[in-house]
Amino acid sequence: MTEAGPAQAGPFRYTLAMHPIQVIERGREDYQPCFDAMRAFTAARTPETPDQVWLVEHPPVYTLGQAGDPAHLLAPDDRIPVVQIDRGGQITYHGPGQVVAYLLLDLRRRRLMVRELVHGIEQAVLDTLAAYNLAAERKPGAPGIYLSDGPHQGAKIAALGLKIRNGCSYHGVSLNVQMDLSPFLRINPCGYAGLETVDMASAGATFAAADANGAPLPVTAAQQPEIALRLAAALCEVLAAHEARALAAEGTAAPAEAKQPGETALAS
């Protein structure tokens, strides 16, 4: 079940579990103020603060994880700023035509271990891509999502990075829809030399509508708002399913707190 306000008027809530999640569409926003807002939200949280998923599109920016090696920026571009941040991982690129979902969650309240959160985020991306007829997969030891067949097999289509502070997460996942991919050629994406990066449009994603001949239509930037909301719904469904399982288990066993370190940064 979804509770939603008028179109274009977020936030709205997914109420699939005991602890609802607010989904907030922030539109296009410069990276630095969005990053600052995530940190401020997390620092100000109380045990009653609702969890949120922020949907954002950023102007062109490179972000470098807290232990990132600047050498992975192979060819700096004066038009694209580089922002050092506190997530795990190396360097990645955000820009127009990309859906970014930031997950501001109380992991202890949701009985979530960090590894379970990463797995859940990846599953939500896989489910979203499947809805647009793209086959993709995880790779052991390399967080994110990669195409599993076709001419772009092995190319990365979604990057993931998190920060855990006092048991609460921020940062999240980016999914390439239809974007200028050339800025990725100036970096070793996520620290991997030669890694191909792809978007949904160039990978041949299609959606339910059909042309005059009955053929499915290709995904373009016009579908980005729909894809963003579908990803948000998939994230909320995965989180709700985990919470339901955890609560069911607690019905027959002593509650087990999801123990989190004070701070953790996960690779992208």
From Swiss-Prot:
Active-site feature positions: 190 (acyl-thioester intermediate)
Binding site for substrate: 87-94, 159-161, 172-174
Entries under PROSITE patterns matching the protein: BPL_LPL_CATALYTIC (PS51733), LIPB (PS01313)
Transferase listed as a keyword: yes
Pfam families named among the record's database cross-references: LplA-B_cat
Name the UniProt record assigns to this protein: Octanoyltransferase
Similarity comment: family membership: Belongs to the LipB family.
Regions crossing the membrane: none
Native organism: Cupriavidus necator (strain ATCC 17699 / DSM 428 / KCTC 22496 / NCIMB 10442 / H16 / Stanier 337) (Ralstonia eutropha)
Chief location bin: cytoplasm
Residues marked Lowers pKa of active site Cys (site): 156
EC number(s) recorded for this UniProt protein: 2.3.1.181
